[in-house]
């Protein structure tokens, strides 16, 4: 194993970037290859495939602001990160470097290109992220989760393969769990999440929506909600007053199993979340993160909504009244919930990690 080719996986330090990297790493290791992760310090919070001795942290900086000071700071950090990545690759001699988006991928991909090491980037969004766009012209190959992402650029489209989003083993296991159809007077298992870093808007809106539901529906709810520590007391107070059966926590380590157990999910629409909802096949109400230059979450949610597997609500329209109306309508129509399950699954790809691994092996020529 120590003589096996090494594949470096570069990813930003959030779940949306790390989880696909982890899923690919699992498949590559099963094929007898070695893997290491190059990322920023945030990744040390996540437990999974990559133990501490498999992680290399390089300096990086997200572009924040356009002032001369902000741009100079970003340039210095990226320069320092690239220098460290160059030294790392000269020592490790990887067969290929695979980037999964986020600004922490820039230094290792810049270094790999300078050393003529084969490179590949994967993008899970319906709209390619800014870091990947910066890298796209110089990499050997591109993989996307969804078709048509780069159709407007023939040069990039020619080296692009649609693989889907690699799924961790926990997601694949959850995808095998059958959906439990909603019984006419049975419990409604509602899961509310805000992405790997939480979302205050869920704490602001969801309790009010639950309060506005018909008193006959409230006792049927079995609610699991991701809530930031600073919002916990006020959210819990509402649910205690309404006598809602609920479990609240800042983060759920077993989120795939909770997705599988749910009958309706209310969530942001990051690429990873949308891909997991599609793979597992669960109905959802998606609230895209507003203000993004690329409107990537709006586009991601649109993929599931257009397929019939989700309801998309822009944040300006995400009020307690609107959410209560949507939950009540779905609770009154169990057949629609079941139809949304089937529709969501038409978007999911459970073989994405193997498809991406095939492309990595081809690019690395191993």
Swiss-Prot record:
Principal location listed in the UniProt entry: membrane
Reaction catalysed by this enzyme: di-trans,octa-cis-undecaprenyl diphospho-N-acetyl-alpha-D-muramoyl-L-alanyl-D-glutamyl-meso-2,6-diaminopimeloyl-D-alanyl-D-alanine + UDP-N-acetyl-alpha-D-glucosamine = di-trans,octa-cis-undecaprenyl diphospho-[N-acetyl-alpha-D-glucosaminyl-(1->4)]-N-acetyl-alpha-D-muramoyl-L-alanyl-D-glutamyl-meso-2,6-diaminopimeloyl-D-alanyl-D-alanine + UDP + H(+)
Signal peptide: none
Broad class of enzyme this protein falls into: transferase
GO cellular component term of the entry, any: plasma membrane
GO molecular function: UDP-N-acetyl-D-glucosamine:N-acetylmuramoyl-L-alanyl-D-glutamyl-meso-2,6-diaminopimelyl-D-alanyl-D-alanine-diphosphoundecaprenol 4-beta-N-acetylglucosaminlytransferase activity; undecaprenyldiphospho-muramoylpentapeptide beta-N-acetylglucosaminyltransferase activity
Gene Ontology BP terms: carbohydrate metabolic process; cell division; cell wall organization; lipid glycosylation; peptidoglycan biosynthetic process; regulation of cell shape
Xref: CDD domains: GT28_MurG (cd03785)
Residue positions binding UDP-N-acetyl-alpha-D-glucosamine: 14-16, 125, 168, 196, 297
Domain of life per record: Bacteria
Subcellular compartments: Cell inner membrane
Xref: InterPro entries: GlcNAc_MurG, Glyco_trans_28_C, GlycoTrans_28_N
Recorded metabolic or biological pathway in which this protein acts: Cell wall biogenesis; peptidoglycan biosynthesis
Membrane association type: Peripheral membrane protein
Enzyme Commission (EC) number: 2.4.1.227
Keywords, in A-Z order: Cell cycle, Cell division, Cell inner membrane, Cell membrane, Cell shape, Cell wall biogenesis/degradation, Glycosyltransferase, Membrane, Peptidoglycan synthesis, Transferase
One Pfam family this sequence matches: Glyco_tran_28_C
Keyword Transmembrane helix attributed: no
Family of the protein in this entry: Belongs to the glycosyltransferase 28 family. MurG subfamily.
Function description: Cell wall formation. Catalyzes the transfer of a GlcNAc subunit on undecaprenyl-pyrophosphoryl-MurNAc-pentapeptide (lipid intermediate I) to form undecaprenyl-pyrophosphoryl-MurNAc-(pentapeptide)GlcNAc (lipid intermediate II).
Protein name, per record: UDP-N-acetylglucosamine--N-acetylmuramyl-(pentapeptide) pyrophosphoryl-undecaprenol N-acetylglucosamine transferase
Species assigned in the record: Rhodopseudomonas palustris (strain HaA2)
